[in-house]
C-alpha cells in the first residue's frame, strides 16, 4: 500500500429497505449525526452486526464523516462490530451485581456454554458479553438474552434458562 492510500473497506451496499429506513430516520433530526445510532441499529437488525463497510455506507447516506459514525458505533456496547451468535447474552458486571454475586452467574454461563466473555459458541448459538449495567440494579444479578431481561438469577437456574433459546 502506498503511504497516501487509505485501507480498502470490504465491498458493502445497503439494501433499498435499509437506505429508505435510514433516510426516514434522518428527517427526524436537525443534525444528521443524531440519526447515526438509529442507522446503526437498522443495519444491525437486518444483518445481526455492523460490518466496517456499513459505517461508510451509513456516513454516505447521512452526509457525515465515517469517523463520526464509527465513534458512535464503538461507544455503544449494544452495537456489534463483529458477527455474534443467534442469541446474545449480556450479563451485568456492575458493582451492584458484583455485590449480589454475578461472578457465579458468569461462571455458570462459561461452564454451560464452554466459552469465555467475548466469545461465541462453536455452533453459533450464543455470544457471551459482559455489560457494565443493565439498569435493573435492585433485581441483581441480571442478564439479558436478546431483548429479554432475567433478574434475581442463580447459577443453578442458568442451564434451564439457556434451553429456552434454541
UniProtKB/Swiss-Prot annotation:
Does this entry carry the keyword Metal-binding? yes
Q: Which UniProt keywords apply?
A: 2Fe-2S, Iron, Iron-sulfur, Metal-binding, NAD, Quinone, Translocase, Ubiquinone
Q: Which GO terms describe its biological process?
A: proton transmembrane transport; respiratory electron transport chain
Q: What does this protein do?
A: NDH-1 shuttles electrons from NADH, via FMN and iron-sulfur (Fe-S) centers, to quinones in the respiratory chain. The immediate electron acceptor for the enzyme in this species is believed to be ubiquinone. Couples the redox reaction to proton translocation (for every two electrons transferred, four hydrogen ions are translocated across the cytoplasmic membrane), and thus conserves the redox energy in a proton gradient.
UniProt name for this protein: NADH-quinone oxidoreductase subunit E
What cofactors are annotated for this protein? [2Fe-2S] cluster
UniProt superkingdom: Bacteria
Q: Which organism is it from?
A: Escherichia coli (strain K12)
Name the family the entry cites.
Belongs to the complex I 24 kDa subunit family.
Amino acid at each position: 500500500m502506498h503511504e497516501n492510500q487509505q485501507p480498502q473497506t470490504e465491498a458493502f451496499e445497503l439494501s433499498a429497505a435499509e437506505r429508505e429506513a435510514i433516510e426516514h430516520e434522518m428527517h427526524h433530526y436537525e443534525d444528521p449525526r443524531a440519526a447515526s445510532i438509529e442507522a446503526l441499529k437498522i443495519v444491525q437488525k437486518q444483518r445481526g452486526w455492523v460490518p466496517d463497510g456499513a459505517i461508510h455506507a451509513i456516513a454516505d447516506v447521512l452526509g457525515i464523516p465515517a469517523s463520526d459514525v464509527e465513534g458512535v458505533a464503538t461507544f455503544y456496547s449494544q452495537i456489534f462490530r463483529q458477527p455474534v451468535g443467534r442469541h446474545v447474552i449480556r450479563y451485568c458486571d456492575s458493582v451492584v451485581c458484583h455485590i449480589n454475586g454475578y461472578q457465579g452467574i458468569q461462571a455458570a454461563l462459561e461452564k454451560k456454554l464452554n466459552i469465555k466473555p467475548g466469545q461465541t459458541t462453536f455452533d453459533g448459538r450464543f455470544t457471551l458479553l459482559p455489560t457494565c449495567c443493565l439498569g435493573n440494579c435492585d433485581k441483581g444479578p441480571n442478564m439479558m438474552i436478546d431483548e429479554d431481561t432475567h433478574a434475581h438469577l442463580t447459577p443453578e437456574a442458568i442451564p434451564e434458562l439457556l434451553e429456552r433459546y434454541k
